[in-house]
Amino acid sequence: MHHRTLTLFLALAFALVSRAQHATNIPSLPGERWWGGATALGSKMPFGKELPAFNLFNRNDNNQVSPLLVSNKGRYVWSDRPFTFSVRQGDLHLDSPFAPITVPQKAGSTLRDAYLAAMHAHFPPSGKLPDSLFFTMPQYNTWIELMYSQNQKDVLAYAEDIVKNGFPPGIIMIDDNWQRHYGNFEFKPDRFPDPKDMVKRLHQMGFKVMLWVCPFVSADSPEYRDLAEKGFLLTDTTSQPAIIKWWNGQSAVYDFTNPHARNHFIGLLRGVQQRYGIDGFKFDGGDNHFYHRTDLVSHGGKGIVSVDHTRAWAELGLAFPFNEYRAGWQMGGKELVQRLGDKDYSWQAVRLLIPDMIAAGLLGYAYACPDMIGGGSFATFLGIDASQFDQQLIVRSAQVHALMPMMQFSVAPWRILDAQHLQAVKAMAKLHATFGHYILQCARQSATTGEPIVQSLEYAYPNHGYAEITDQWMLGARYMVAPMVSAGTSRSVVLPPGKWKDDRGRVLKGGRTITIDVPLTRLPYYEKL
């Protein structure tokens, strides 16, 4: 057998044996349900009788993962290292190649008890926030409109259309392909003839400006050769820079377990800010599966595993108040913006937004954004004529966003909507701005207490049979939101105990389920009295 093949075979065999040695089965208590592990599993939470194995080493389903599971009976599981979890006949099953995972910690009797205990023990809040503008105004991203054709003329036109159509300016993000190549942080001169002036004009319009960046470096570029010589790239067992396959091809990648590489990268970004007036960065990539290879050699040593690279990438963002992430490992309670993974343009995707946001909160990611209004997966927008969009879907998606911690536009509503639907979406942007002070207040409270901003009814009102409700949420302690997430104009709403005032000013008695009419322009929300 070839030496390299034998080495890989033995490594795999060792991993399998080790995993078998450290299996933990956790029988469920009567009525116990579990949440956690991965933001993208939100729609499956609370987990049912069966859940296929989810490996935190090499899977993230395009979003944040964390080694935390919490139950509605006040128990939680935490491990500093990644593990595989599944549910078998209602019981939680854990596999770890490192060491046995201890039995669940009993912290109380509710989901909130479990979360708070885990949070205080393992990811207490930093006391800091991303910039307040994330919470108080809508965000705008150029991705869906420009995709890989980012350019100065169209970026400015997009921003001008935002203002011209009566939307409040906020943060604007210039997405991928503004740069000459990966690892380079200069604008393409043919597309951006005067980027400094562009940023100046965007600032004059009232925007803060962020740029898309990633940890990848185009092979056979000047940056690649320089970084390789400095030892700032992740290598393989041949001591050569490892080539990683990702969604834009194959590239080398920074090794941020090397503090000198980290400081070098931050210095490059600071240079971009100084040269062009950029306010911050959208940090894409960093997914655990890119680093899950047995032949990778990192500066941090043999104990480094895939998720350690994900965390090292996330730690960069702490240097920039204007930041955004999609992939994550641990880092709950930190002042990082965490966006949901790219969602399709579909009703099914609209229905995923609320449970995924609830899941993000239960992993400690309070400062979260529910992807882009209408969807952020560009492939699902290809080939659709502007006149063929489901306009109701865009409106309902905007309504879900409006009373979340953040809302982000990408597809231009004024391009695809008629006057009636455009007005409905614009009203949601203005509603978010109106609620901005309260949302920021919730964020500041979260920075102190560590509590999620978006809370499920089970979290806020335990032991009322609310575990399965995933189309309503509490925005802080004061408001409950119940939007339409399917085509139609009516829905049932669960009112928890107490008195509630709805968006139309009516006072309602809680502790019951009501059926309400939800015309296109209505976002039902309820203030707790």
Regions found by a protein language model. Name each.
Residues 161, 165-166, 188, 198-208, ...:
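Carbohydrate-binding surfaces of carbohydrate-active enzymes
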Residues 75, 82-84, 145, 179, ...:
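Short, glycine-/Ser/Thr-/acidic-enriched flexible segments
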Residues 130-145, 240-253:
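N-terminal small/glycine-rich loop or linker at the start of catalytic domains
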Residues 168-425, 458-461, 476:
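Aromatic- and carboxylate-enriched substrate-binding clefts and catalytic-loop regions
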Residues 1-22:
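Bacterial Sec-dependent N-terminal signal peptides
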Residues 64-74, 359, 395-408, 441, ...:
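Short, hydrophobic/amphipathic alpha-helical patches that form generic packing surfaces
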Residues 21-134, 152-164, 460, 517-529:
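Catalytic and substrate-binding clefts that recognize carbohydrates or anionic sugar/phosphate headgroups
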Residues 55-57, 64-66, 127-129, 160-162, ...:
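Generic recognition of flexible, low-complexity loop/linker segments
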